[in-house]
Amino acid sequence: MVLNHSPPPGLYITGLGSQYPPYLLGPEKLEEFAARFYDVESPGLKKLLQINRSSGIETRSAIRSYESGFATRPEAPTISELAEFYHQAGVDLTTQACKKALRESQISPQHVTHTIGVTCTNQGNPGFDLLVNRKLGLSANVDRMLLHGVGCAGGLAIMRAAAQIACGASMRRKPVRILAFACELCTPNVRHDLAFAEKAPNAENISIAGALFSDAAAAFVLCNEYAMAETEITPLFQLLEWGNSLIPDTVEHMAFFADVDGYRTVLTRDVPQYTKHAIGPMFEKLLPSYQSQIQSSSGEGVGEVAKSLGVSDFDWALHPGGEAIIEGAKQVLGLTEDQLQASREIYRTRGNSSSATVLIVLDRLRSLGKREYVVATSFGPGLAIEMAMLRRCEVDED
């Protein structure tokens, strides 16, 4: 049998939307809150609060202050209470991010063909994506997908899933307009983070999640070439390559699961050591295909440039999982502060909002970064690494 080898489908991000909640909490707020309910001299909690002071985060975005809601009660919220709260506040936050992405794409809700959602801070069936779809007024015939179990890697996992769906549609010569979104409400779980730290038998066994995580939602619209033929807008990015991989023998270093006392986070101090050594091999694996696609779709001059592309030629949307993760990537890859400025800014001013963060960094990179070539990468339980390689559709020549 002879197969016709057609060029890769065209995949374009036409809109991005980020949405933070109204509150910003400094490290001192967590200390004051912890002192109200817990023994701050216990070894585990004392260590967590030390990390909180030295995390490099100036403010974390929060859906509520430490003076309202669950924070005012003597007992921690139950999982069912957290779920009910998420279905209101989380769905509202996600809807706002989605509206921004749709507005920039100039796509009406009725023309969305697929939705892909992700979260690790809400469980249940039907998933929160159905509530978002209803609030946006999407068609009842929209194809829905909700990812689970991918944690902080979720933002790029939904981009990978969107790309695969769009490629399949292109093979069938059908237009797709995929609305993908991520939302995490981490701060309502802080009572459980503090309680687990207080009970820890020693300072070595604590999770540092209570000092890092914040709340946010993000969304993007991805269209294939058939959908782009029906619009006159200039897309933001072309998505050219993507991939994911597990880092061997690391499954015990990151987790988030329902415990009898609430949601529990596992995040060991060894994570940055593993993640920093996983980025380079994934980049080298994806680069040849990325270069080939640029060469085949560009003029001779750009094609020659593509042959020599390396780490230093890209703006990096690195998931800022922590100060050590950012520093580790910078050290191993030889990145400059200029290449990491969006990741630094989001981490410093908003903290780590899990799956939504890398998409927010990519959104911020639009105004901070200047390079034509962009790579985004994030990490999640497994340990897993996700990577996407993009190309700006409009480049500032200044």
Swiss-Prot record:
Enzyme superclass (EC): transferase
Pfam families per the UniProt record, alphabetical: Chal_sti_synt_C, Chal_sti_synt_N
Active site: 152 (nucleophile)
Keyword vocabulary terms for this entry: Acyltransferase, Transferase
Binding site for CoA: 47-54, 267, 321-324
InterPro entries: Chalcone/stilbene_synt_C, Chalcone/stilbene_synt_N, Polyketide_synthase_type-III, Thiolase-like
Amino acids binding substrate: 214-215
Pathway this chain belongs to: Secondary metabolite biosynthesis
GO biological process, one term: polyketide biosynthetic process
GO molecular function: acyltransferase activity, transferring groups other than amino-acyl groups
EC assignment: 2.3.1.-
Catalytic activity from the UniProt record: 11 malonyl-CoA + acetyl-CoA + S-adenosyl-L-methionine + 12 NADPH + 22 H(+) = soppiline B + S-adenosyl-L-homocysteine + 12 CO2 + 12 NADP(+) + 12 CoA + 8 H2O
Family assignment from sequence similarity: Belongs to the thiolase-like superfamily. Chalcone/stilbene synthases family.
Subunit and partners: Homodimer.
Described purpose of this protein according to its UniProt entry: Type III polyketide synthase; part of the gene cluster that mediates the biosynthesis of the alkylresorcinols called soppilines. The biosynthesis starts with the HR-PKS pspA-catalyzed carbon chain assembly through nine chain elongation cycles, using acetyl CoA and malonyl CoA as a starter and extender units, respectively, to produce the polyketide soppiline A. In the first round, the KR, DH, and CMeT domains work to produce 2-methyl-2-butenyl thioester.
Record protein name field: Type III polyketide synthase pspB
Name of encoding gene: pspB
